[in-house]
Regions:
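Hydrophobic/aromatic beta-strand elements that line small-molecule binding cavities or substrate pockets
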Residues: 94-100, 112-115, 127-133, 146
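Short, cysteine-centered beta-strand-loop-beta hairpins and adjacent loop/turn segments enriched
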Residues: 115-123
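Short, low-complexity N-terminal intrinsically disordered segments enriched in polar/charged residues
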Residues: 1-52, 159-163
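Short beta-strand edge/turn micro-motifs at domain boundaries
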Residues: 2-6, 123-158
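Hydrophobic alpha-helical core bundles mediating ligand binding, dimerization, or RNAP-core interactions
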Residues: 25-32, 50, 76-81, 113, ...
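A solvent-exposed, acidic/Ser-Thr-rich amphipathic alpha-helical stretch
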Residues: 41-105
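Beta-strand residues in well-ordered beta-sheet regions across diverse protein folds
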Residues: 57, 109-110, 142
Length: 163
């Protein structure tokens, strides 16, 4: 499931970067789910994964969260957590996590999340490209772009070509 490509980094450093980012996403998923299901309430835990300023771009919006308060606030990730609580969200798993190392301080992560409700039914397939940067606090998501369900090319798995 995980792939890495290197651009100007040594194989050893690329391997470590991929390992570090995989570890971050292995912690991120459960933290996000626990917050969204109400098992925990320490919203500051999200700051272990996000770095301000945080840019999030979707098909109908482009928002910039300039500081930690904006990230955690109702117009930021705090609002997303609240919406999921109200929608009977219960679980999310990372179906794809392809890491493309850009250099020793940046990587793109092509991820596909599967969100499920309390009965286990699929609520949403959420594809996102993350720009992850090495900050003074460690690896942090600094930008996220919601994409069609697909890869960096933007060609979704659910699209068909008419050849």
């Amino acid at each position: 499931m995980n792939q890495s490509k290197q651009k100007g980094t040594s194989t050893a450093s690329t391997s470590q970067i991929v390992s570090d980012i995989n570890e971050m996403f292995e912690r991120y998923g459960p933290t996000f789910v626990d917050l969204a299901t109400g098992k925990r309430s320490d919203m500051d835990a999200l700051l272990e994964f996000y770095g301000a300023p945080l840019r999030f771009i979707g098909p109908t919006f482009h928002m910039v969260m300039k500081d930690n308060a904006a990230i955690l606030g109702p117009a930021g990730m705090g609002g997303e957590i609240d919406r999921l609580r109200q929608a009977n969200f219960a679980a999310s798993n990372l179906d794809r996590c392809d890491i493309n190392v850009l250099n020793d301080r940046a990587a793109l992560v092509d991820a596909l999340w599967l969100r499920r409700d309390a009965k286990g039914a699929l609520m949403e397939r959420f594809a996102v490209i993350y720009l992850v940067a090495l900050t003074a606090e460690g690896w942090r998501i600094t930008s996220a772009v919601n994409t069609v369900e697909g890869s960096l090319t933007g060609k979704g798995n659910n699209q068909t070509s008419k050849d």
